[in-house]
Amino acid sequence: MKPTLLILALLGSFASAQDYLEIAANPGGAGKGRSIVLVAGDEEYRTEETMPMLAKILAKTHGFNCIVLFSTDEKAGYIDPNNQKNIRGTEVLDNADLMIIGTRFRQLPEAQLAPFARYLNAGKPVIGIR
């Protein structure tokens, strides 16, 4: 019976997974009320590892709400830096105050690209890292 409960608990955690990683802000920081979206998507520089670390520093030390988007496998949903055609959750850019992007050679579908275009056309700030 216990293994069955463990399996059900694990399946439930996968079913409720988000399309992105959200790190809550430290309420006392200078970035209070501001949101940063960090976009990770390259196979060479391992931004899927470094962006969450940067997001945690920005959230916990400086008080920004941070969301990290990842290049993911379209079917299974796991983080896949080699997948150049899928970054889920790009609609969160509509509420971002800053975008930090570390991607290379992405070919996203129009639905995922449109939030990038809206963000850039709004004249909001971008930091690109490599």
Model-derived segments and spans:
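Sec-dependent N-terminal signal peptides
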Residues: 3-14
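Active-site-flanking alpha-helical
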Residues: 9, 129-130
